[in-house]
């Protein structure tokens, strides 16, 4: 009994969870599902087990989606059991599992009777589907389960008929499997349409599902107590409910009776699981739903679910089950329920109606609604699609009726309260409506119960919401898996599952609808439903893809909606999905089964899509990690292969669907999947999988390839089967799509691709299906993903696949080592071997995608990082730890050479290939060296020197190669820069080793002469001159420096001299010879080097801050010109002031980091120390002690905090990456290891040292340390000299200038400016690396955006550096460049001047701040960096809040850097609209300094979400997690940017320019007081939730719990004197190094100019002196009373004494809850302070606690799941509306309906689950489940309504509208709708909050605005209850605020939401205080 094993895996998992379920499952499933399907579920289970961490995400996703529906059920059942088991095991997904299991109960019942069906259907899904049913069964289940739903109904009918019939149904199942099911289904569906069988089936399914739900519930109860008594109760309730349903639903009486009947059948499950739980939820939901008791069931369900995490999920599940039941029960009305589901979704616009069903409704609307809408909109399609237009007509009528009814009902219901209208709906078509109402109620239930998902769905658009709901659920599941995964996973999984169930039901319905024609319709509808499931899947993809999808599948999230609007623009556009696919495949869909197949492909793409998005997370993730799936499935390889075939087919379908929908969505699926997989699948799958199976990957690849070949055969057979039945369409959904295009080709491609790419299957499938249809575009995306994956993930995974297939012997090394080219070759081989059709597309698309993916480099990198992170788990465990090549020098040099060669080869190979290879190489280098992709790309974007350098063979080839090789390719340059060109040269130069300057001279002829003149410098210069050639040479220089230091630290870490020679000599040959093995070898070498260096350092016991002795060979001396920051002697024409210096010491640093697993890790970073002389060294040594000492205080708590941040942020994400990958994160993980691990160290260290350091350090693992070391060096010197290191360049320069230390000023200024630039650059790099790491984790979905972002970022950096160079030259050469400083000062007016002001103002303070600087050096460095960078991205964002003050002069001097950087596309994109906000902020700045500060803060935070992340980094100072989070956020946001790209990057990027701009006086002013605080708040929020959420579910969750935990304790501790000092430090660090130190120096400084201006002069000066002083002492201790009072307005926003002391008392108090959302509270506090400023101190206090907590749950939770997820969908959507509205209409619309709705509920829900469990447990208790649902529903619907109603406004003012949302109009909308929306929860919250009752409008206002304006009253009431009720009230508040802050937190939209909300809050504060002006003025500001 494979299935029994599968079920037993599942069942074992289930057994673990519930043996009964397994028994039930076994009993039910044992017959046949046990055999064949089990493997599928087993494999799925295993797969999702591997994905388990993400399984919760992806499980939820998987669960929600394809797996969710059926295979998802199976997968989810299995995955749920596995995932849930693993999740339960791992995350206590027992709740999550239960949700998943509940889902999986649903689905497991479904899966069970999916498996039962699979038992019965197993022949069909099981046999044909076995693989397909495993994978596709879930789609097939979804489809079969739609078919299987029909089958399930049949099966239920069969089961109702008997399990025997079900078992007979097995045989029938086989028949129905292909089509028999559909006939049966049709018969039964028609019978079911008669509603007996379908309700019967539905009920049995429901019962089954309920038992599963119960089992899951029981398991979840595990957690069985509730479930047990609930089961008994539920059994009673089932009996009751059935009678009720009988009473209530005449039809349902039948279903209920039949359910009772079935209960007799299902009693196993029912009683077993006491299906009563699910049935109780069901029965209750049915009864309640039928009785309109939805609140009750919801409450029960919620109570249960929250008790109940599963009851709510079970309720959701029950709702889902009811949905299923109803869908099944209403399968007569199946389409009506579906229509209700779908049509409400459709009618709801899928948004209002089916917020929850909107996913289903969107998805189901896509299916039902789409089928209904398809029936209605695509009515032909759904109808003909349904294949039974009669049924569709009947159902279609019902569906249209339902659509009308349901849409109306749903919209009405959901809009009203769903209950009334649902009851109305119920009333409307009593039987039909009862079923519809049951569905309406179910939807109301789902809307109420699933209001979370529905609200999420509604919140999303209902289209996205469904998926978003799911994704939100899924996102919530991401949090849910962690904390409220149980509830959220359950609730959301069950909601998602409910959606999936609805989806499944929709398939059931659809299958019911698509009776016999329905088989295609089953398929199609299944496809449709799987599509919705894919919507969910794509929403799952959206969740992973959310981030990635935000750019790509933003179209799939919103753009999945968009893409599915492309496909089916939203899954409501599942029509369009089917229309796009149907368009592409509507024709295809018109192409009957191909159409349905395509729909199945779409569905299965999406249904498997979900699975492949879960499976594609496994499948596309398996693309990059079909190995992951394979690996996951490697556990159950057959299943995997079966599932992988579906998974890969599914990934392909997903990709295809997405590709079909959108090549971007295709990319989305990939990147979604890859990112999802990376994020979830890769982290989960890859981590699990690759951890588990680099070898297994080989095996699995072999097996999978074999199986895939089998599957290929199966797929080929399946194409026949598809012809035979929808099985192929389902099974080969991707094939189906391609099959639609060409079944044979698809089959062959699919089959072929299976081999080449189970990895590429997802890609190839993605490529294939779209390859036919969208093959090339898709492949373009797939290829980049493949390239990405190939580069490292695919290098690891695809090479595991490819190379495992081809090179099984060298999976890890080959995976790593395989070139993209080799990968491409291998894949091509495999593709050729497998199917040349795909290959045709792949190589081209591969290259095309290479380009695409270069844009998606971030995705690639994130993928790679995540993937390599996962692989590194395996890899590091094996290769890094075990395989420690002894030839470190030669290997490292070889590594560098190989990197260069590989890069060169790739670059030289083709332009596309070269670019792709470059991207791959860059990524490889980045991953290897932990070099942030952003740095690589900007380096790449700095190709000016590239052409010159390329010719140089040795140095260039060695390391300069990287930059030299980038002739026109900026990337090449960056790579060379990063690779050891500089290092070798520098090392040689300094080591006296033969300088390869002549080659460099050849490269740099003119320069090389100079270089020759300055031989030692020339070497470094040779590298630098490449960089320095252009003004961007500084950037490159720093890039190179970072790269060099990084590599140098590796290089140096080994024997730098020896290695240099080796490097130069061996790298040349090796460089070319070992291009392919190089990556793996380089990885290994890097690891070995790191290990060796670590060993050296450990033996030496050298403090991490202290450079090793120069004689150790580990230190690279990089001569740096302090005047220009360039490598001395090369590009620098300045006379060397000293023969010996100044120079950067690039040295390896060891940081002991506590991994999320609690293990201690030694992480190797590059330290950078600027040595100007022995004096500096003295300082350096001082600093060594200082940072170490600082490390000691901060390190333990914040190390833990950081680790926990990492752990909490990426336990799931980073658990894969960091827990598993923590040890072996692959390049990214190596990077993350170095970066994240290093980050904790560095963060600790940096925390200890300075936020800037950790920021700096976190950016780069090695360069981080390097930068950190440099900065530490600088800092040590500066601290010795000036305490401020970050500040020291400016401050110290100013000070020294004031001191008239001309040389020191010049050299120091120059050094420090360059150092700062370097530090900034390195920090940026690190930040980039951190972002890359973090973003890798978080941005995995967003990877595509990263390259652009990187480019923009680095252009910004380049310009900032150029400006910085100028400034440095001016400052450094101030005596020399008298005019230039004026010019620079004129351009960067305040760069030195303001620095002088800032630095000089607190000259004494600086001394005071030395201690503070110890705390704030990193922030100072960040400040420098920001100064240098113009607050580039992170500094811009994070530091500029504080720096906003200091940067306000600096804005003037940085306006040019800002502007120059703003001129950069990154900043342009970023600045474009955030800049508008900034400009508006600037415009309004005087009127609304606080307001705009707040706005700026918020908008800055919005825009500064990267900066926010930085601030979050600083804030989180576990900021390394924050940084990582920030990075992740960046990546996530970059991914979001890809999703939210215009906006996200604009928002995030605007942090570069706009934030710079805002950091310009406006931003800086805005941000400095308010925005900094708000940005602190927001960023903190954003970071804590967003970054957390972006970090990953687990990172988010762990960030939420762990980070919360550590933040709670450690930040409490930090809040306590340690946290105060560490809040000075750590909160600065937490706020952001820049906020920390900028709060110290920058806030000092920024407070000086901006905040000074904002703060009263006294506050300014006080803040300058007092804040600076207090920041050093008081800020550390309490920020000083005056600073507290001064910070009150401004820094309250920031964390000033009030915030610090607030944080101390309040925020510390809150820091346990709030500082958990430390960033949230801090942000909250900051926003609070800003809002406090705006609100009042008490409001600030209230804001502090309330809003902190408010933002804690809402933001963290919101940001956590929502920002991660919603940064994917919601942030995409949030940014979508916010940024998109800001930046694009799509974003706007998506944002407004989807994101708002979605974010609101989604984040509400998702955050609700997590934070609900944490924060919202109170909120939950306060906010009844139904109220939460209702709140969510209403918030969703009202936010949707609001957002929709405010959509124009919101669109017109994204910020304003989000303001609008948060601002009066939307507040009004929110007030009206928010009142309504928030009425329930706000009422309940108000009720709990007390004063909130009367604040309904205020809360609606405050809902939107309340977050914004957690006014003193609101927050005051919310303070007692607002803290706890801040969870509820905040939830209601946060519901809107979630909407706003959610949007604000999760992404830029969250930021914009925060911006809006805060602006609205500010506006509301302003609205309250200056409401019209604030609301409106802020709006323009935000809009501007």
From Swiss-Prot:
GO terms for cellular component: extracellular exosome; nucleus. The keyword NAD does not apply. Residues 450-463, 1058-1067, 1205-1226, 1458-1471, 1492-1508, 1960-1969 have a biased composition (Polar residues). The keyword Iron does not apply. Residues 1593-1935 are annotated as: 27 X 8 AA approximate tandem repeat of P-S-E-R-S-H-H-S. Residues 1636-1647, 1668-1679, 1692-1727 have a biased composition (Basic residues). Sequence repeats lie at residues 1593-1600, 1601-1608, 1609-1616, 1641-1648, 1649-1656, 1657-1664, 1681-1688, 1689-1696, 1697-1704, 1705-1712, 1713-1720, 1721-1728, 1729-1736, 1737-1744, 1745-1752, 1753-1760, 1761-1768, 1769-1776, 1777-1784, 1785-1792, 1793-1800, 1801-1808, 1848-1855, 1864-1871, 1880-1887, 1921-1928, 1929-1935. Keywords: Repeat. It comes from the Eukaryota. Residues 1238-1247, 1532-1558, 1568-1579, 1620-1630, 1648-1667, 1680-1691, 1728-1869, 1895-1917, 1928-1941, 1949-1959 have a biased composition (Basic and acidic residues). Expressed in sperm (at protein level). Residues 448-467, 1045-1067, 1181-1287, 1326-1346, 1439-1984 are annotated as: Disordered. Residues 1599-1610 have a biased composition (Low complexity). The P-S-E-R-S-H-H-S repeats give rise to an antiparallel beta-structure. This is Spermatogenesis-associated protein 31H1. It comes from Homo sapiens (Human). The lineage of its organism: Eukaryota, Metazoa, Chordata, Craniata, Vertebrata. The gene is SPATA31H1.
